[in-house]
């Protein structure tokens, strides 16, 4: 289950925008957006059976490599990194797992007309004071072709959270 706690522009039974080839989104009033934003809460249980344990100071370099493997272009990866890095780089370690099934099941996405390519990157992460051994996660991306929809986000799992 997902509850949207904040959206921009306002989410009224969905967003109605037209996507231009350059990525600009235009609503029915002619207002242009570079992206749509939503924040929410879910009771989804995130899977940390595979992932990475990264030193805080190595987080930017790790994310640059990981996000490229997951299919984000340079601009998208830059936006992702500048959003998350201030919360992560000072930690001794970050345990990171990119969620696929659990995220896409919790946060359904419907786009009309259907895109040729959908890239959804969702990072669950947790601060750690010590190195944590974790099976390495394989990172892959679909081939970008035609009309491509990109969504990225993440969540910090606080110590003591059961997710």
Functional labels for PLM-detected ranges:
Residues 1-163:
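Protease-labile, long low-complexity intrinsically disordered regions enriched in Pro/Ser/Thr
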